[in-house]
């Protein structure tokens, strides 16, 4: 054995076309957690997923851009459903799973805001405490 993984993390961001991407993102997250556990059964697995609640987003692929607009109601509904599936399907695959919600457009001047900054900070801090506790117990 060359190395032993003690903590492994996977991070996925869904910025647009949420429901078109959800299966690929869920497979990536859960696959990463399972792969890590196969190789290092005692490893602490941490999953992060970020969901964009913005009505507008500009995707970039090389030199091409793809502007997307959703109604406010559509953005809310699609983002809520994406967040629900992430928690329900990906969450249980990890020892710790943190869902981050934000608004960003990927358009100048590149505005960004957490939906609930205080709540995200509290959830992140609590996750770090639990991870540290798990680390002390496992290693």
Regions found by a protein language model. Give the residues of each.
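Conserved catalytic cores of phosphodiester-cleaving nucleases, focusing on short active-site segments
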Residues: 1, 5-15, 29
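Generic beta-strand structural signal
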Residues: 5-7, 34, 41-45
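Nucleic-acid nuclease catalytic cores
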Residues: 38-60
